[in-house]
């Protein structure tokens, strides 16, 4: 549809377009225009947080040269002809004010070419004071380039309120992130001051859409999210929700989209929270959800930024979202019920189903509360340093040398370079920490000093053989903090060792019990070794301070280990061999 100026009676009924408040407003408007043009590649280049320059290049259908001058006028659009067209709108823009608003506060250059044009056309405008605007021919591939220079050059008062350039650039990044989250098939790139900041590659396979979340939230553990898809009431809900029984701290992420348009809607958020409250009381609920609904069932013409919409049937939408999320949470709940059946040895490493029962069978609850048994509190490393005087107060931390040696630097996140007696050694921190925790567990068992975490009673369905195995091992399990109550046909688990509280312990316990079912006879050392392999060795980014702490702990808990350290813990670096190679 060609660009045309809307008649005054129609333009007066459309809500006012967004005022350009900051550089992020410009980026949002021009990206949405590119998406409406069918672009597959959108590149944004920003200088000085957008105040000096914002450049967007796309490979969309372009603007015909005869429409280029109209494109920068108020109420000029190709999206609608009448008010009724809003009911079947599928594009972002429709008011025809984006480029006009940007033009009013900047020096704007617009270059575009369609597949029907032999040559591209270019126009340059400075605010609304530009006169005798001339179309200039220029070489340009199919698509559009928009250059916004000197934003707010003619409104210096606005610049006084936008002094924090880091904040303004972060808002630009957030705009790109929100749009990229709902347009998987588009390549997005963002450069700032000639430096590539983000690059989101297109994803055309639905199964790989979760990769866009990984790209955008680089520290996010996507394994803690569940994919959902539900279709009902002529609506489709798709996306990801955080695992209801995940005990790791994850970033609080809440993104709602309706017909691929980002918005924050109370109906959305309240429906999701209500669904979670029926399963598990969680303060931090994360989700990225996409609702597809027929255009005539929503009104997008109620807010200048289009970040709010009106549902014509809000109760139906709320019910649909609530039922969709709750049904998936309920399935996950049932999946993690305890159901131990160990008939084959090959099932040892398979996840077992967990069955959790409340006193009311109609409302099953997974661990509704976990609290620490106020029995004993282990001393942390700071107390060890304080009371055992491992380090003199006058000794600088970077010069502290343990019996292993002096820690120089951290290498590849997990290893420490240590200098000792003119030798360089490489220490594995994950292995070292695992050994320390293993030794501490042995010490606590010997002293009957295991700290327990109490759970709301968890009912475990067992076969007669499994029941007998656990019954014969109940004493050794109690030493580790597993308190089991044996009923006629099932077992109730009421506590676990405290060191499991930060793990996904429902999976750990499943695998641990499966390990027990395959062992005719189990000793304390066997269980300690199992936890060492499956729980204690953790790959985390190590810092210099944490490295010093683990050296102190090895000295304190495992002094004999230093006489003949295992090869997986400590490796000597052959400096002499390297020097021989380097000699001229």
UniProtKB/Swiss-Prot annotation:
Which is one GO molecular function term here? ATP-dependent DNA damage sensor activity
Sorted alphabetically, which InterPro entries does this protein's record hold? DNA_mismatch_repair_CS, DNA_mismatch_repair_MutL, DNA_mismatch_S5_2-like, HATPase_C_sf, MutL/Mlh/PMS, MutL/Mlh/Pms-like, MutL_C, MutL_C_dimsub
**Domain of life here?**
Bacteria
Pfam families per the record? DNA_mis_repair, HATPase_c_3, MutL_C
PANTHER family to which the protein is assigned, alphabetical:
DNA MISMATCH REPAIR PROTEIN MLH, PMS, MUTL (PTHR10073), DNA MISMATCH REPAIR PROTEIN MLH1 (PTHR10073:SF12)
Function description? This protein is involved in the repair of mismatches in DNA. It is required for dam-dependent methyl-directed DNA mismatch repair. May act as a 'molecular matchmaker', a protein that promotes the formation of a stable complex between two or more DNA-binding proteins in an ATP-dependent manner without itself being part of a final effector complex.
Q: What is this protein called?
A: DNA mismatch repair protein MutL
The lineage, from the top, is: Bacteria, Pseudomonadati, Pseudomonadota, Gammaproteobacteria, Enterobacterales
């Amino acid at each position: 549809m060609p660009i045309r100026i809307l008649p005054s009676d129609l333009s007066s009924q459309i809500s006012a377009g967004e005022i350009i408040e900051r550089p992020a407003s410009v980026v949002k408007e021009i990206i949405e225009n590119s998406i409406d043009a069918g672009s597959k590649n959108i590149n944004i280049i920003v200088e000085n947080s957008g105040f000096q320059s914002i450049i967007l290049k796309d490979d969309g259908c372009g603007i015909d040269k005869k429409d280029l001058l109209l494109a920068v006028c108020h109420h000029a659009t190709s999206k609608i002809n009448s008010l009724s067209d809003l009911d079947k709108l599928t594009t972002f823009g429709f008011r025809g004010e984006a480029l006009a608003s940007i033009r009013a506060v900047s020096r704007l250059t617009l270059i575009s070419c369609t597949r029907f044009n032999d040559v591209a056309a270019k126009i340059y405008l400075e605010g609304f004071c530009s006169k005798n605007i001339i179309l200039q021919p220029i070489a340009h591939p199919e698509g559009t380039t928009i250059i916004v220079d000197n934003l707010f050059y003619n409104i210096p008062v606005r610049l006084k309120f936008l002094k924090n350039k880091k904040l303004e650039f972060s808002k630009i990044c957030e705009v790109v992130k929100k749009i990229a989250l709902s347009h998987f098939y588009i390549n997005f790139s963002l450069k700032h001051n000639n430096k590539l900041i983000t690059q989101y590659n297109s994803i055309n396979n639905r199964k790989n859409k979760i990769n866009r979340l990984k790209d955008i939230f680089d520290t996010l553990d996507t394994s803690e999210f569940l994919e959902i898809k539900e279709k009902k009431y002529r609506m489709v809900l798709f996306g990801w929700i955080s695992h209801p029984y995940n005990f790791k701290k994850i970033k609080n992420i809440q993104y709602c989209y309706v017909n691929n348009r980002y918005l924050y809607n109370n109906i959305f958020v309240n429906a999701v929270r209500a669904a979670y409250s029926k399963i598990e009381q969680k303060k931090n609920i994360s989700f990225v959800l996409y609702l597809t609904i027929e255009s005539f069932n929503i009104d997008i013409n109620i807010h200048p930024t289009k970040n709010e919409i009106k549902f014509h049937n809000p109760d139906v939408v709320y019910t649909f979202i609530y039922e969709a999320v709750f049904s998936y949470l309920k399935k996950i709940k049932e999946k993690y019920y305890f159901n131990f059946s160990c008939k084959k040895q090959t099932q040892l490493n398979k996840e077992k189903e967990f069955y959790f029962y409340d006193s009311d069978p109609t409302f099953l609850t997974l661990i509704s509360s976990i609290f620490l048994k106020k029995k004993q509190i282990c001393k942390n490393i700071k107390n060890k340093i304080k009371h055992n005087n491992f380090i003199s107060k006058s000794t600088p931390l970077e010069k502290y040398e343990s019996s292993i040696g002096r820690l120089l630097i951290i290498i590849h996140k997990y290893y420490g370079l240590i200098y000792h007696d003119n030798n360089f050694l490489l220490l594995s921190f994950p292995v070292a920490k695992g050994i320390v925790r293993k030794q501490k567990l042995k010490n606590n068992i010997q002293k009957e000093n295991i700290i327990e975490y109490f759970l709301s009673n968890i009912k475990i369905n067992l076969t007669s053989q499994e029941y007998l195995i656990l019954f014969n091992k109940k004493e050794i399990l109690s030493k580790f903090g597993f308190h089991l109550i044996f009923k006629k046909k099932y077992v109730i688990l009421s506590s676990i060792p405290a060191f499991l509280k930060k793990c996904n312990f429902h999976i750990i316990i499943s695998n641990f019990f499966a390990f027990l079912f395959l062992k005719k006879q189990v000793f304390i050392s066997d269980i300690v070794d199992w936890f060492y392999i499956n729980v204690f060795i953790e790959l985390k980014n190590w810092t210099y301070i944490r490295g010093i702490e683990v050296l102190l702990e090895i000295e304190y808990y495992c002094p004999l280990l230093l006489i003949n350290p295992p090869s997986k813990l400590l490796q000597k670096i052959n400096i002499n061999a390297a020097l021989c190679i380097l000699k001229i």
